[in-house]
């Protein structure tokens, strides 16, 4: 999957660990959405 920035990672992608994974069809079972706003396409999810 494509890494993405969770809210807990910090405000920007620069210098922060991207702990989420981008899912286009929503978060799979056992995962949760870790970003309140965006990304524009898909959902940023983590286990």
UniProtKB/Swiss-Prot annotation:
SUPFAM superfamilies: Defensin-like. One of its GO terms (molecular function) is toxin activity. Disulfide bonds join 4-44, 6-34, 27-45. Its main location: secreted. Keywords: Cardiotoxin, Disulfide bond, Ion channel impairing toxin, Nematocyst, Neurotoxin, Secreted, Toxin, Voltage-gated sodium channel impairing toxin. It is found in: Secreted; Nematocyst. Gene3D superfamilies: Anthopleurin-A. The keyword Secreted applies. Binds specifically to voltage-gated sodium channels (Nav) (site 3), thereby delaying their inactivation during signal transduction. Has a heart stimulation effect on isolated rat atria that is higher than that of Hk7a, Hk8a and Hk16a. Belongs to the sea anemone sodium channel inhibitory toxin family. Type I subfamily. This is Delta-actitoxin-Aspp1a. It comes from Anthopleura sp. (strain 'Zhanjiang') (Sea anemone).
């Amino acid at each position: 999957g494509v890494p993405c920035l969770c809210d807990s990672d910090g405000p920007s992608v620069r210098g922060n660990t991207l702990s989420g994974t981008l899912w286009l069809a929503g978060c799979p079972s056992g995962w949760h959405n870790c970003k309140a706003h965006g990304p524009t396409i898909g959902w940023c999810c983590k286990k």
